[in-house]
Regions:
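Beta-rich carbohydrate-recognition and catalytic domains
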Residues: 1-20, 31-87, 94-152, 162-218, ...
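Conserved positions at the start
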Residues: 23-25, 88-91, 155-157, 225
Length: 267
């Protein structure tokens, strides 16, 4: 493993009521040729005893002319559909091959459960003009997958590839109840107007903390994939947070991953 240090520039920092207490866990990706970043904003309610909307997913768009990130959307689950939300995180937009737009997110509900959910969005929101942050109400959702008895929580990690118009392979992270260690598995989903179908899940975790910089750090035993770039027909580079202290890069073989998914195929 090669280890190097690089100079970085802060491009997103607290500046609104939606992220005044912190900006964290960014996912950077492309939709319709544009760069988007969805991150978790620690909102003005973060330390409030009321426990409502403490964190919210904020999406910024990269402006090629300004060469800067512009905060454009904050996604708010409808109280009518979700009830009261304590937090919402592990989120990103994703466009399928048929042009349909989805929002993958992990709300923490008032009953103290966390839910791995997908909401449909109108693609027209991407063309909304202006420079201010727009609140987008999420008025629908499908729960995708529940916890295993030994898991503490699940969260969306990063999407990998679309297969055709309606299928998506994505990474999901899970924590165990005993050590609170993060591990990663993959799932294949089929998305349509009527339903979300979980077609396959790897029968074992495909990534777990192993190296010293993943085992020891500000948040030990943590590997947290946040990005993926396909570099060849078979290979995807994964970027991940390591123990909340370093950034790791790994290479994933899609052929090997599909073989693992076939072992856990449901449909």
């Amino acid at each position: 493993v090669n280890m190097n240090s690089y100079v970085g520039r802060i491009v997103i920092y607290p500046s609104t009521r939606y992220d005044i207490w912190g900006t964290e866990d960014p996912r950077v990706y492309k939709v319709r040729g544009k760069l988007y970043m969805t991150y978790t904003g620690r909102s003005i309610n973060y330390f409030s005893p009321i426990r409502v909307n403490r964190t919210v997913p904020v999406t910024a768009v990269y402006d090629e002319d300004l060469r800067n990130w512009i905060k454009r959307f904050v996604f708010m689950p409808s109280a009518r559909v979700f009830g009261r939300i304590i937090t919402d995180k592990d989120a990103f937009l994703h466009e399928m091959g048929d042009g349909k737009l989805y929002f993958l997110h992990r709300p923490h509900l008032i009953d103290d459960t966390t839910r791995l959910m997908i909401s449909k969005l109108d693609p027209k929101i991407l063309s909304m003009g202006g420079m201010k942050v727009e609140e987008i109400e999420l008025d629908n959702a499908v729960e995708v997958l529940d916890l295993m008895p030994f898991e503490g929580k699940l969260g969306w990690a990063t999407p990998l590839v679309n297969i055709g118009d309606k299928k998506l392979i994505t990474l999901i992270h899970a924590t165990d109840k005993e050590q609170l260690a993060y591990r990663v598995f993959a799932a294949q989903l089929s998305l349509s107007d009527d339903e979300v179908v979980l077609e396959a899940v790897t029968p074992r975790y495909i990534m777990e903390p192993a190296t010293p910089y993943e085992l020891i750090g500000d948040r030990p035993l943590t590997i947290f994939p946040c990005g993926a770039v396909k570099i060849s027909k078979d290979e995807v580079v994964i970027s991940y947070g390591a123990a909340d202290y370093m950034i790791g890069l790994g290479i994933l073989s899609l052929n090997n991953l599909m073989a693992e998914l076939d072992k856990g195929r449901i449909y």
